[in-house]
Amino acid sequence: MGKLVALTLLGACLALIGERLLNFRERVSTTREIKATEPQNCHLIEGLENGSEDIDILPSGLAFISTGLKYPGMPAFAPDKPGRIFLMDLNEQNPEAQALEISGGLDQESLNPHGISTFIDKDNTAYLYVVNHPNMDSTVEIFKFEEQQRSLIHLKTLKHELLKSVNDIVVLGPEQFYATRDHYFTSYFLVLLEMILDPHWTSVVFYSPKEVKVVAQGFSSANGITVSLDQKFVYVADVTAKNIHIMKKHDNWDLTPVKVIQLGTLVDNLTVDPATGDILAGCHPNPMKLLIYNPEDPPGSEVLRIQDSLSDKPRVSTLYANNGSVLQGSTVASVYHKRMLIGTIFHKALYCDL
């Protein structure tokens, strides 16, 4: 009898794992023909060769770019080099990327920047918040931006037990931000198991000096996050679920779901067009090529624009699409005055006029 029970349980477990493996394959093996779409006057940005995972642009047109991310399971073209933060001035006729010098107590050799977000205080001082993965841990680094010197001063490192496996961040006040956790576990084996079983345990965390709490959960893999222009709604990308969650922000910083927009492609980072309020999404149209990288058959890139996101019928259009021949593994697109920057996990970055 005992052996029969054991065999029954084993069979049930194997059946569950088999079903979950098929489900995982379905989620990440999207293979569809990419119809090339390119705005006028696009060119690769010189000096950005090792990824440009996230981009955030100040209202003045200064764009911060995080580069050199080393992420488990993803390719890295310069695995032994620390990450950098670059700056581009989109007011210039021919903007160029320059690496920002960093001063302060940060161990720059362990800089492994992921999501970034800017905040401007009442005296117009700009601060850059950076999700960092030193030795594959998760911290949030706070920098003060010195515009005249074009440099960053490291002010503080934030750590918390809820800030584990952090992917992206959106800052709404001094040391007040939402952060996404793309995995519940942190060990590589358990992360793989989590990806296969897909328990929907990832979440959005609110951080402040007085309170840190989970404000939304139940995502397959919470990824990019941003906020509407009026700061009433928070947009969360659920990458492997291929959708965007629109959440209402309350005075106590809690989030409640409003709607979900299905996109049919893996959604990475999100930004908002400051001129229109439209959501821009950096996407992965053929994600299996990210996991099994072949330079002869590279992953493509895709940027979607979502208009009227709160309406019954949001309008989704393609701003950029490429099969990987130009740009591989797009993660983010950010715009300023009809100029668009597109970043990638490990590849290059693209500038386009819209």
UniProtKB/Swiss-Prot annotation:
Major localization listed first in the record, in broad terms: secreted
Keywords assigned by UniProt, alphabetized: Calcium, Disulfide bond, Glycoprotein, Hydrolase, Metal-binding, Phosphoprotein, Secreted, Signal
Modified residues (Phosphoserine): 165
Subunit structure: Homodimer.
Recorded family membership: Belongs to the paraoxonase family.
EC number of the protein: 3.1.1.2, 3.1.1.81, 3.1.8.1
InterPro entries on file: 6-blade_b-propeller_TolB-like, Arylesterase, Paraoxonase2, Serum_paraoxonase/arylesterase
Top EC class of this enzyme: hydrolase
One GO MF term attached to the UniProt entry: metal ion binding
Cofactor: Ca(2+)
Entry protein name: Serum paraoxonase/lactonase 3
GO cellular component: extracellular region
Glycan-modified residues: 50, 269, 323
Cofactor binding note: Binds 2 calcium ions per subunit.
